[in-house]
Amino acid sequence: MTKSVRMFGGLLAACGFLAAQPALAETAVRFGVDAYTTGSQIWVAEDKGYFDEEGIDAQITTFATGVEAIDALLVGRADMSVGLDFPMVSRIQGGKLKVLAGIFHSTPGFHKLVVSNDIQEPSDLKGKKIGIATGTAEHLITIKYLEENGVSPDDVEIVGFTSLMEIVASLRSGRIDASFVWADGTEKSTSDGEHYVLTDDSAAKLKGSAYIAAASGFAEEKPEAVVSVLRALDKASSFIEANRDEAADIIASHTRAPRDTVRNLLEYNAFSLALGDYEKAGFDAVSEFVSRSQSTEVTFATGVDASFLTEAVPSAVTLAE
């Protein structure tokens, strides 16, 4: 291009004669998240502009629990959702969702076992009513805790609930005697002086992770969008690890948990996208339990599709051959 042509083009642009370049079309992606911190990377990716950078129009719906967020995939209310390992693994067998990546490791201590004051050791739980958030990771933690501490689940009465606040209210009213709780539920369930924290989820001896999954149909129809989402979440993971205080501000502005609670909860998670031996070991432990309880075999090989993360963040896939 000659200098005179460039100058003429610049003059036309300055005078408004050249049409503005159209913005790149964004792909709409419907996300399902819980009301606490499992969706941390999604909120950060939205607020920091990482989705925009990757051409994603994020449409985020908050559900009471991760279970509901995952179920939204199965009924067509979400394209991608995040959740902890147990509810994710227990819903794979229908083939309607693909697990794409681990999004964080859960370090011990997130769930606290709150019990009535008359319960002093695990054996005291026999004959008691124990609340669970049915189908969640807390459900599995409860069962594994009992088994690890010599208490058969058959020796207690399991009472199912659909939300943390239901569990808290039932503890305080005496409807149940014990339950693993989390987030602000710990303080709310012990402030009456009639309950205390006996232990935390480390006593269940599980390797916990959270995952992001996509509806199988969406992943097959829009694989580029799935890869773009994973790239955005990888950026968000790095931001959270380096800026926990600011991340807590962002996450709390979108969730039901107070800012200080969110900041504390972030300390129980190591945020990074990954598919490696850690994720596989944790997945296998959950799938063994699911296969036993549902009489349906669930495996890492059939439930996880590493191809999307391999394209998005190759270094994040470290599975042994």
Task: Give the predicted meaning of each segment.
Residues A19-A25:
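Sec/Tat signal peptide C-region and signal peptidase I cleavage site
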Residues G9-A19:
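Bacterial N-terminal signal peptides
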Residues D79, F86, M165-S253:
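Pocket-lining segment of extracytoplasmic ligand-binding domains
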Residues M1-L11:
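Bacterial N-terminal signal peptides that target proteins for export
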Residues A78-V82, R172-I176, Y268-A285, E311-L319:
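Short amphipathic alpha-helical segments at helix boundaries and their inter-helical linkers
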Residues E220-T296:
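Secondary-structure end/capping motifs
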Residues S291-E321:
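Conserved C-terminal helix/tail region of periplasmic/extracytoplasmic solute-binding proteins
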Residues E26-S152, I158-F161, I167-S170, D177-A183, ...:
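Short, glycine-/small- and polar/acidic-enriched structural segments
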